[in-house]
C-alpha cells in the first residue's frame, strides 16, 4: 500500500487582542473545509492554527483589564480555541506563541540570523501604529494616519535590531515570477510586486525596547523580538523546526502546502516570511492564499467600530452548520463578502430549509408512507420521458464530484458548495417531474414509485458525502436518517451503491426549520445593545491607560476638559421667525458607511440612516474624524437641505457640528441613546 501524500495547511494565528468575530472565524471554517476535503481525497493532512500572543497592544489591553499579559492572553486564547471548537474545526495542532518550545526556537532563529549577518543593530525614528504594530514613514501615511487602519500614529524613536530585507529582494522577485501559483489570487501578487517589491524594500525592524511583553533577545534582553519574526515562525517551530536539528514531523510536512490568511496580511506572508525562510535556507510554502474579508453590511467588521457579529451568537441563533454554510457560501474567491442578520435568515430559509432540509424530509417521509421505510431498487424506469428524466438525474449526480474537485483545486470553496446544492436542487426538480404522490395512487406504478424513491435516496447519499467537507454534522445526520454511511470520494461518481432493501429511519428529523425574522431580530437587538455597552466600557479603560479622556455618548473626545474651556461669544445673526425655523427638519441619523472624498483633503462622504431611508451627506470634517471613527455614530442631521454637489459628490443634508475658537469641529450627538430618525425639536 502506497504512503498517503501529505498536505500541510495553516491559518494565520489569531491575535489575542480580543474575542474573534465572525470575519475571523470565517478563516478557520474555510481552512477546515479544505482540510476535510483533502482528507476525503486520501491526503495525510496536518492542519495547524492557534494564537499570536505578544505585542504592545496586548500589554496595554492587559493593563486596562488590571491583569498580567499572560493572564490576559490565557483568557483570549482559551476563548479563541472554544470558538474554533464550537464551529467544528478539525485542526491537528493549536499553537500559542507563548508556548515554551516556540519561544526557545524563536530565540535560536534570531541568534542564527544575527550571527550570519542578516540582522544588525541600529535605531529607529519614525511613526508607529500600536493597533497594527507597524512602523511608517511620513510619506506612507494617508491623511496623516496609518494607511492600514486609519488610526492615529505616534512618533517613536528607539534602539532596535533590523533585518536586511533588500539582501533577498531580487531573489524573492525571481521566485514569484517563476512560481505563478505562489501568491493567490493573482491580484494579491500584482499588489505585492508593484507596491512593495519593485519600488524597493527597506530593512525591517525586528525588535522593540519600548514594551516588555514579548520574547527577549537572548544576547540583548532589553530587546523583545518584534511581532512578525515571532508570529510567522510558528509555522515551522510548532512542527519541530530547530536550527540545531529538526524533527521528523517537520521533515515530513515542510514546506507548507497552503498558508490561508486574510488579504490584509498578505504583505507579511509573501514578503517578510519568504525572506526569513530564504535566510534560514528553508524551502518556501507552496501557496499563500489571501482570502477576502467578510463585511458587515458592506463595511469592514471591526471591534473598534462596534459593528461586530460573533460566531457564538450566530451558532446560538442558527446552529453550527448554518453558520458554516453562510460564511462559506457568501464569500467569493476574490471580492469581499457581505453579512447582515437579514441575509443570514434569508439564506437559511431559501437554501438550508427549503432546498436541503425539505428534500431530505420529503424523501424519508414518502419512503415511510408508501413502503414502511424500505428503499428498494426495482429497475422500473417508466416511459421514455421518465427514462430520460432518470438518466439526467444520474448524470447530474455522478458528475458533481468532479465539478466540486475542480472548484476545490482552485480554492473556490463558495463555488464548490454551490455545485453540491445544485445536486440537491436537481433532486427537488426530480420530485416535481416524477410526482411520487400521483404514482402512489396507481397500483401498477408501485415499482416505478419505489425506483423513484431509491434514486432520490441514492442521490441524497452522494450529495451528503460531498457536503461533509463543508457541513459535517448535517451530512452525518442525513446519512443516519437514510441508514447508510458517507461514501468514499473515489466512489462518488458511481450511482446505485445504496443497498437495496435498506430501511430508513421511521422518525425523520427536520434538519433546518424555517425561521421568521420577527422571532430572530429581537434577539439580535439584545446582542447589539450588549456589545455596544461592552465596547464602550473597554474603550474607556484603554483611554485611561493611554492617559486620554474617555469619550461619552454626547460629550466628544475632550469631554474631560470641557469644564476648562473659556465661554465663546459670537456675532449674532439676523433673527428669524418661528415659521422660518419650522421649515428646517432635524432628525437623529446613524452613520452606516463613510469614506474619504477622493478629490478633497477635507471632505468625508457618509451614508446616514434616517428612519427607513439612507441619505448621502458630505461634510468638511476629515481633519477631525477618520472614516472608521464615523461608522456607527449617532449624529444630528438637517435632513431637508436642498441637495448639492461638493467636490463632485452629491450631498443630501448636513451634519451638525460645534466649532471652537480655533476652528476645530466636533459632531453633535444625542446625550442619550436615540433611534435613527428620531425628530430633533
Where are these regions (language model features)?
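Helix-rich, typically C-terminal accessory recognition domains appended to large enzymatic cores
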Residues: 121, 330, 342-379, 396-504, ...
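Secondary-structure transition/capping motifs at alpha-helix termini
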Residues: 1-3, 37-44, 64-65, 69, ...
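Phosphate-backbone binding interfaces of nucleic-acid-interacting proteins
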Residues: 545-681
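Cys/His-rich short segments
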Residues: 116-169, 173
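N-terminal catalytic cores of NTP/NDP-binding nucleotidyl/phosphoryl-transfer enzymes
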Residues: 2-76, 95-110, 115, 132, ...
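A glycine-rich helix N-cap at a beta->alpha junction
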Residues: 77-92
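Intrinsic disorder at enzyme termini
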Residues: 475-580
Amino acid at each position: 500500500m502506497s504512503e498517503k501524500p501529505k498536505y500541510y495547511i495553516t491559518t494565520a494565528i489569531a491575535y489575542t487582542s480580543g474575542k474573534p468575530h465572525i470575519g475571523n472565524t470565517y478563516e478557520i471554517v474555510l481552512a477546515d473545509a479544505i482540510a476535510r476535503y483533502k482528507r476525503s481525497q486520501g491526503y495525510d493532512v496536518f492542519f495547524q492554527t492557534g494564537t499570536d500572543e505578544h505585542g504592545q497592544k496586548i500589554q496595554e489591553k492587559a493593563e486596562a483589564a488590571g491583569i498580567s499579559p499572560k493572564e490576559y492572553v490565557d483568557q483570549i486564547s482559551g476563548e479563541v480555541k472554544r470558538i474554533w471548537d464550537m464551529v467544528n474545526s478539525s485542526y491537528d495542532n493549536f499553537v500559542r506563541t507563548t508556548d515554551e518550545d516556540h519561544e526557545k526556537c524563536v530565540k535560536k532563529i534570531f541568534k542564527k540570523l544575527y550571527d550570519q549577518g542578516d540582522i544588525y543593530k541600529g535605531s529607529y525614528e519614525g511613526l508607529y501604529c500600536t493597533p497594527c504594530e507597524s512602523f511608517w514613514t511620513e510619506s506612507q501615511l494617508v491623511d496623516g494616519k496609518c494607511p492600514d487602519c486609519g488610526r492615529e500614529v505616534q512618533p517613536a524613536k528607539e534602539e532596535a535590531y533590523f533585518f536586511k530585507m533588500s539582501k533577498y529582494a531580487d531573489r524573492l522577485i525571481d521566485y514569484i515570477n517563476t512560481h505563478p501559483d505562489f501568491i493567490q489570487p493573482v491580484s494579491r501578487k500584482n499588489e505585492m510586486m508593484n507596491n512593495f517589491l519593485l519600488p524597493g524594500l527597506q530593512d525591517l525592524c525586528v525588535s522593540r525596547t519600548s514594551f516588555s511583553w514579548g520574547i527577549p533577545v537572548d544576547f540583548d534582553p532589553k530587546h523583545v523580538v518584534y511581532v512578525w519574526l515571532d508570529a510567522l515562525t510558528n509555522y515551522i517551530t510548532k512542527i519541530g523546526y530547530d536550527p540545531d536539528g529538526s524533527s521528523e514531523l517537520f521533515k515530513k510536512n515542510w514546506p507548507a502546502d497552503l498558508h490561508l490568511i486574510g488579504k490584509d496580511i498578505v504583505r507579511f506572508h509573501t514578503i517578510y516570511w519568504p525572506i526569513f525562510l530564504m535566510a534560514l535556507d528553508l524551502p518556501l510554502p507552496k501557496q499563500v492564499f489571501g482570502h477576502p474579508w467578510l463585511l458587515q453590511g458592506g463595511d469592514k467588521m471591526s471591534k473598534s467600530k462596534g459593528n461586530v457579529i460573533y460566531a457564538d451568537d450566530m451558532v446560538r441563533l442558527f446552529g453550527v452548520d448554518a453558520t458554516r454554510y453562510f460564511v462559506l457560501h457568501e464569500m467569493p474567491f476574490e471580492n469581499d463578502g457581505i453579512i447582515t442578520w437579514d441575509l443570514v435568515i434569508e439564506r437559511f430559509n431559501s437554501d438550508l430549509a427549503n432546498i436541503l432540509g425539505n428534500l431530505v424530509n420529503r424523501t424519508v417521509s414518502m419512503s415511510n408512507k408508501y413502503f414502511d421505510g424500505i428503499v428498494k431498487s426495482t429497475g422500473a424506469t417508466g416511459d421514455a420521458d421518465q427514462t430520460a428524466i432518470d438518466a439526467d438525474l444520474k448524470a447530474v449526480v455522478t458528475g458533481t464530484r468532479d465539478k466540486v474537485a475542480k472548484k476545490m483545486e482552485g480554492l473556490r470553496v463558495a463555488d464548490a458548495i454551490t455545485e453540491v446544492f445544485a445536486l440537491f436542487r436537481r433532486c427537488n426538480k426530480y420530485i416535481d417531474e416524477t410526482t411520487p404522490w400521483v404514482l402512489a395512487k396507481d397500483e401498477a406504478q408501485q415499482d416505478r414509485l419505489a425506483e423513484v424513491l431509491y434514486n432520490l435516496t441514492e442521490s441524497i447519499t452522494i450529495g451528503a458525502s460531498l457536503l461533509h467537507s463543508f457541513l459535517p454534522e448535517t451530512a452525518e445526520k442525513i446519512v443516519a436518517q437514510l441508514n447508510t454511511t458517507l461514501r468514499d470520494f473515489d466512489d462518488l461518481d458511481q450511482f446505485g451503491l445504496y443497498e437495496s432493501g435498506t430501511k430508513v429511519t421511521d422518525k425523520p428529523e427536520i434538519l433546518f426549520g424555517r425561521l421568521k425574522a420577527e422571532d430572530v431580530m429581537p434577539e439580535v437587538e439584545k446582542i447589539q445593545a450588549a456589545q455596544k455597552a461592552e465596547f464602550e466600557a473597554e474603550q474607556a479603560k484603554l483611554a485611561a491607560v493611554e492617559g486620554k479622556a474617555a469619550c461619552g455618548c454626547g460629550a466628544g473626545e475632550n469631554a474631560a476638559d470641557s469644564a476648562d474651556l473659556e465661554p465663546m461669544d459670537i456675532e449674532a445673526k439676523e433673527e428669524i421667525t418661528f415659521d422660518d425655523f419650522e421649515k428646517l427638519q432635524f432628525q437623529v441619523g446613524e452613520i452606516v458607511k463613510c469614506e474619504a472624498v477622493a478629490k478633497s483633503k477635507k471632505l468625508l462622504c457618509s451614508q446616514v440612516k434616517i428612519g427607513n431611508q439612507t441619505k448621502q451627506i458630505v461634510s468638511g470634517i476629515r481633519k477631525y474624524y477618520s472614516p472608521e471613527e464615523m461608522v456607527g455614530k449617532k449624529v444630528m442631521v438637517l435632513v431637508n437641505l436642498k441637495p448639492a454637489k461638493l467636490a463632485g459628490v452629491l450631498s443630501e443634508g448636513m451634519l451638525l457640528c460645534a466649532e471652537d475658537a480655533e476652528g476645530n469641529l466636533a459632531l453633535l450627538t444625542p446625550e442619550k441613546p436615540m433611534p435613527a430618525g428620531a425628530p430633533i425639536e
